Amino acid sequence: MDVNSEPVKKVLSKYKFRDVAVEELQKVYRVYPDMKIMAGTYTSSDSLQKDLLKLVGNIPVVYQGRSYNIPILLWLLDSFPFTPPICYLRPTSSMVIREGKHVDSKGRIHLPALHNWDHPKSSVNALLAEMIGKFEEEPPLGTKSSAHGDTPSNLLDYVSNLTITEGGNRPDQEVKVSVIGGGDLGIAAVLSIMAKSCVDKLVLIDIPENSTKGGTMDLEIFSLPKVEVSKDLSASAGSKVLVITANAWSDEQSYLSVVQTNVDMYRGIIPRLAQLSPNAVLVIASQPVDVMTHVAWRQSHLLPTQVIGVGCNLDSQRLSHIINISLVANNTGKQAWVIGELSENKVAVWGNMGPGTDQLQALTPVSNSTKPLMDRAFEMIKGRGQRSWSVGLSIADITHSIVTNQKKVHSVTTLAEGWGGIGSKVFLSLPCILGETGSTRLPGVALGSEDEMKLRESVACQVNLFMQLRL
């Protein structure tokens, strides 16, 4: 493998572990002598460009007794081999990518070896061996339909009629939901969603957290219909909803360092989840939910309507229930909502309901005549806390509205920029209509001075925190 060409030497000189990288490349050459090392410009998903090395070549795949060559490309980051390659298929103009469990619609390859990369235990040769094994189970390429009678060759002539049943959100696909996080909240979310009977398949992905848990193992022992337990993020491919319950908490850390730990954990899972299920709605339940929903949106590069947090949905449902029991709201055409940050700064407002419907038409601030009632009800819900099982029920409520396209209103964490004069990119709980494509935020409302101050304080705190976080 020629690493002495001027373009390669120029780029390689900027690599942090040059000698180790060259040694790893030589190992690849001994097993795959046709692989070529080249210099190129890599463009990331956020349009940033960087000069990197890339491995280009074919890997041999045997499918049903026949051997085929699969063209691939591996981008090597400047911290290679201590960071995994970014792997893509290299289809020609006559090829079509077969989106599946290990390949997304853009041809990016997702494998356990990449997710669990740990050099020197991990190597490119081992990665390629796993890639070959996965592609032998599920061929990743086919041919495009040709009006000119072109003769397909190699793998394409054999797999052009194969139907890949996994990956992507197609109209005829089963309703699949994935819960990422194996702690008590993850288990509660799984059981609550299953009780709603609104999904065909539910995947619980158990990722490492700084907590003691045994529920995931119990689910594996006492298996439930429609529930799959996995440790591989790729099992979530093709999900309609991705629920993130994972937390990396520690009582020994400062608040900033605890949040940063969660941000770092998200960096390892959110981008890949978004790539595996690009049409999914992300429902964030990690804490602090307002901050982590913002982080998930930034890291996933999804539309803001596709990323929501559980936010004040539970508090809103509790508040409404308490007020309805008092028989005050039954004849007023109003419903109580909790909005803002999930903290002491959350705010209660009224929602005007459409005549004879459950559709929210507009929000109104609490008037002097209804303030005593609202204050008493608000104090009652503050003491109830947010235990795993209750948050799990709230997650199921939100998930049900999304997968059944109910167009129901929930107070969920969403991008608040532009709502009620908020000028910063922050996430707060606001009433949103939820459906299969995500959330639609309802118009803002003029709040009283005290409530307005609470919202502004929440915005300022979030802005200040994000200035200190490493995303």
Swiss-Prot record:
UniProt: NAD(+) binding residues: 183-211
An MF annotation (GO) of this entry: oxidoreductase activity, acting on the CH-OH group of donors, NAD or NADP as acceptor
GO aspect biological process, one term: endosome to lysosome transport
Record-linked SUPFAM superfamilies: LDH C-terminal domain-like, NAD(P)-binding Rossmann-fold domains, UBC-like
Domain UEV: 2-145
Gene Ontology cellular-component annotations: ESCRT I complex
Entry-linked Pfam families: Ldh_1_C, Ldh_1_N, UEV
Keywords noted in UniProt: NAD, Ubl conjugation pathway
InterPro entries: L-lactate/malate_DH, Lactate/malate_DH_C, Lactate/malate_DH_N, Lactate_DH/Glyco_Ohase_4_C, NAD(P)-bd_dom_sf, UBQ-conjugating_enzyme/RWD, UEV_N
Top-level division of the source organism's lineage: Eukaryota
Record's subunit section: Homodimer.
Purpose of the protein: Possible negative regulator of polyubiquitination.
Family label: In the N-terminal section; belongs to the ubiquitin-conjugating enzyme family. UEV subfamily.
Listed name of the protein: Ubiquitin-conjugating enzyme E2 variant 3
Organism in which the protein naturally occurs: Danio rerio (Zebrafish)
Name of the coding gene: uevld
